[in-house]
Amino acid sequence: KTLAVSVRAKEFVSYHCSCCGHCCRHIENCVMVESLDAYRMAKHLRNQHCGISSTDDVLLRYCEPMPLTDEGYPIYVLKTVGADATCIFLRENQCSIYAARPRTCRLYPFSVGPGERGRDFEYCLCFDDNQQHHFNSGKVLVKDWLYHNFPKEDKEFLKQQYLVIPEIGRLMHRMPEEMRQAAVFKILFYHYYHFELDQPFLPQYDQNNRSLLNELRKLAPSE
């Protein structure tokens, strides 16, 4: 179980990474792989000559699909291996894709959510079963951690995501149940598969969202 406590950017928190790999274990269905994550992972692994040439390859080899909502909104999570549900990318207690690790991993032990009262984002410190390993020494200034691990591209991606996800949810809720499987396939296509690795991510994501909403509106009856 994870306890999330709201923090401000100017706060100091006790945290120290000892490179023990504990936060990479017991993570089954825990680490979401978002569109931007899959794109970065694919580019990184392609450059490492790992037999990866597209986001499709990454998602098939390293991720599992799962529904996030009752309507079946699809997401991907990292695959795990072994009895202790270890991240598929953990090698000798080190992340083998560290430079392209998912945002969830880069921000740990913090998380980001939609902001309130005029703020773009809210930040939380996440306490979990690894508390004994990470939260007993060291000091981290929240804004410094975010500066290094939450770049502008991530912020712009999340702003777009926060705008489009509620609309997708409303459209899926209005759809006849027999249309939802078709909607799931369209979401997977436009949010995960329809990307060129040699083109910038954000313009593609923006266009994909426009195309996706147009397709979903055809499946949902007018109000």
What label would you give each PLM region?
Residues K1-E223:
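Short loop/turn segments that flank or connect secondary-structure elements
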